[in-house]
Amino acid sequence: MAESMLSLPTPLNISIWWNMGSILGMILGLQLLTGILLSMHYSSQLEMAFSSIIHIIRDVPGGWFLRLLHANGASLFFLFMYAHIGRGLYYQSYIIHPRVWMVGVTIFLVSMATAFLGYVLPWGQMSFWGATVITNLLSAVPYFGPSMVEWVWGGFSVGHATLNRFFSLHFLLPFLISGLALLHIIFLHDKGSSNPLGNLFHLSKKPFHPYFTIKDSVGFLMVFGVLLMITFFSPSLLLDPENYISANPMVTPTHIQPEWYFLFAYAILRSIPSKLGGVVALLMSILILYFLPLSSYGKSIPVSMNIIYQVLFWILVVTFIILTWLGACEIEEPYLSLAGPLTLLYFLMFLLLGMSNNLNFNLIQLK
């Protein structure tokens, strides 16, 4: 297996955007290591959860460092995952490698679930209220909703049973992500890596080792350096200050919001007046990635020759960034009015991305 990976024929012209996958693998390994070490000192007892985090920071040798590496590592993991998905979208990997794309989207979904469960574990104010608000979305499911919420909570409110099962699932899911990542790599080896030109010819390829292992090592060092700088100099940059306050069911935070990497979906959820409609839009904002391989009917034109596709892609990127900003804003005007049209634009761009290939293909045939 290792020999197969090292001798993988890799295109000579791949850019830095092809480094994201290996960087994600490194961060996943780091998250597994720090997570296992932290779990040795964490207590999922309702009365002890917040105190155990304080204990890790104050009393465990290097505990503060492990916790901050784990928390900020999750943010970097999603940052590079979005860059990885963006590269796949831009260079149309969903057409060239549909199975790789499908497994990748599944990894993304499981990662989001894992991150949400981990966000609840410190049992701070935002942990408690975030868990209450997000799990309560299940009540929008017709007929079965209220029963599903109580089943997830393990009672009539978020409490000890909720925290216990969230801790168990948060511990298990990263191993599922690792298995899916291995499947992702196996499917990638079926055709080999794509490149900016979109061809899969083996004439201009070199073995992965040593050329690209050295290149990836540079990326590892740079990313690890950035993670250390954030951890040492600005540890709370990507964290929510509300979570430094112990959970109190009697005091509601002024603004309940998830971590920054979920804000685009949160903005889409809030933009729909109907609760059920908002939940459906929230799910579809991610599940729509599954439908991309079906949208182009196997016709792939190199992105350098498809100006329409490039314009649509960058409109989607800008829309995503603005939705992320809106998700962090208060629930008031003009932010609510902006979220509606941008949600529509977000879904429209995915539809047009698939159609643009066929449109461009027909225009070329006409010429």
Swiss-Prot record:
Q: Which UniProt keywords are given for this protein, alphabetically ordered? A: Electron transport, Heme, Iron, Membrane, Metal-binding, Mitochondrion, Mitochondrion inner membrane, Respiratory chain, Transmembrane, Transmembrane helix, Transport, Ubiquinone
Q: Which GO terms describe its cellular component?
A: mitochondrial inner membrane; respiratory chain complex III
Q: Where are the membrane-spanning stretches?
A: 20-40, 64-85, 101-121, 166-186, 214-234, 276-296, 308-328, 335-355
Locate the residues binding heme b b566. H84, H184
Q: Where is the signal peptide?
A: none
| Keyword presence, Cell membrane | no
Q: Which cofactor does it need?
A: heme b
Q: Which topology term describes how it sits in the membrane? A: Multi-pass membrane protein
Q: Which PROSITE patterns match?
A: CYTB_CTER (PS51003), CYTB_NTER (PS51002)
Q: How does it assemble?
A: The main subunits of complex b-c1 are: cytochrome b, cytochrome c1 and the Rieske protein.
Which purpose does this protein serve, as stated in its record? Component of the ubiquinol-cytochrome c reductase complex (complex III or cytochrome b-c1 complex) that is part of the mitochondrial respiratory chain. The b-c1 complex mediates electron transfer from ubiquinol to cytochrome c. Contributes to the generation of a proton gradient across the mitochondrial membrane that is then used for ATP synthesis.
Look up the further comments and give them. Answer: Heme 1 (or BL or b562) is low-potential and absorbs at about 562 nm, and heme 2 (or BH or b566) is high-potential and absorbs at about 566 nm.
Q: Which named protein is this?
A: Cytochrome b
Taxonomy of origin reads:
Eukaryota, Metazoa, Spiralia, Lophotrochozoa, Mollusca
Protein encoded by which gene: MT-CYB
